[in-house]
Amino acid sequence: DCISVATDTLATLPDGSPAVFSTKAMYLPHLRMIVAGTGVAGIMGQWVQQMNDRMVLSGILNVAFHAPTNLRRIWAIAQAEYDLAEDQTATIYHLGISEENETFGFMSRSTNNFCSETLRSGWGVKPECEFPEGETDLKRGVQTMMAQQRSIQASKPANERIYIGGECMIWHLTRNNCVSFKAFEFSDHKDQRAQALKSF
């Protein structure tokens, strides 16, 4: 059994213009768990820092118990500090090898008060796209799906889009180890980086 996670690295301003490039998933070896985040920037990073520096946890099942209360607190502070709009949200995904040595995953959504929601086994994507039939190469399959995601999002009104860009990073977790690597770079990465630098 294994778990693979793929993300882009582009973080945008509310208007969709490039802001920074960041790591959107992190691996905590002592918990055998990958944490990934979407939506409002910084929520995942604060949660990972808290788990790593200020909590005693036995594994992902223990994390699922403690996540709601702690994420609600982190979210409330972010709402007050940054005056977040009502339509701004955050989702945190937790994927790992459990205390019972089984693959397990759950998500915590601001739209559901950060309750721990168990994820089913199999593929999961955000935003929506189709799975490439018959593809056996992970890197190639992810590249196909992300290209389709970008195409779908480009067809939507600007204020409804999820922006994807920068580089694609992949994490591959097994019971014994976790590897991460850069899978590919989006064709407009350099242009996005130039735009981001202008905003500083």
Q: Language-model segments: which ranges?
A:
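Structural motif
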Residues: N101-M107
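Short beta-strand elements
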Residues: H94, M107-N112
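Conserved short S/T/G-enriched processing/targeting/catalytic segments and their helical context
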Residues: D1-E86, T111-F200
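Short hydrophobic alpha-helical segments used for membrane anchoring or interfacial signaling
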Residues: Y93-E99, W171-L173
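C-terminal catalytic or substrate-handling cores of phosphate/nucleotide-
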Residues: A85-D87, T91, F104
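Gly/Ser/Thr-rich loops at beta-strand to alpha-helix junctions
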Residues: A41-G42, S98-N101
